[in-house]
């Protein structure tokens, strides 16, 4: 019987994490459970920075970006002795189960705790939308709006100066954020891990556009694929048109979550508590075709793959 639940946020922050925490806290308290917030992710869990939360702890947080519990990178959590200490801290507070909000690295920590017999539920909180078993992650659509606003502003200045602009977008090894941003932002070209890059073809396409009277272009590029500034130099040399790179960086993680992300996070937080009360542990939550689902967290990490949105890549190709 679950009586006390812990909740933490880990890895890169994402808009909507506070709404997810609120969903966990309010649902658990309403069911007569105690809730404990763990500050600064797995690092705080290891160091024992754990505090009991009440309803007022999550008042006025649903509209705030970031995470009031804080987050931290803590690669040392891979070590067995570190996790054993973390579990000791949980048991010292009488915490029976843990809700972890974060990306794939956070899921890996939850997986390790699960393998050590400690029940965890993972909620997908990352702007990268790179978690298997869910159509959307918490924060993804808010970040999408942030990127689109930036692209709109870049288009204003690019058209004024007849300039080619490269905009580097987060996502790591997943091109979802870049793909959707490129379609919604009306970008002329897209470079993601799924599409790869043929530089000669790209420069040729830009030259063809210039010959037809096109005065500017926006290129959407997923981070980590290449150096955006070096690519800008190559394009400028190949086309004779001024080319500049803009790295959006961490601005994509900030800002008030959209209504969609607030509702999604609230639903997932609520669902996580109900799963724990029903005796489920070692699960991760997702939303598929607007329905909440849960998967084995080990299977999700080791075996499940995110589908490539070939339908949207086809749309993008035909629109560009």
UniProtKB/Swiss-Prot annotation:
This is ATP-dependent 6-phosphofructokinase. It catalyses: beta-D-fructose 6-phosphate + ATP = beta-D-fructose 1,6-bisphosphate + ADP + H(+). Allosterically activated by ADP and other diphosphonucleosides, and allosterically inhibited by phosphoenolpyruvate. It comes from Vibrio vulnificus (strain YJ016). The keyword Cytoplasm applies. Its main location: cytoplasm. Belongs to the phosphofructokinase type A (PFKA) family. ATP-dependent PFK group I subfamily. Prokaryotic clade 'B1' sub-subfamily. It is found in: Cytoplasm. CDD domains: Bacterial_PFK. ATP binds at residues 12, 73-74, 103-106. Its EC number is 2.7.1.11. Its cofactor is Mg(2+). It comes from the Bacteria. One of its GO terms (cellular component) is 6-phosphofructokinase complex. Substrate binds at residues 126-128, 163, 170-172, 223, 244, 250-253.
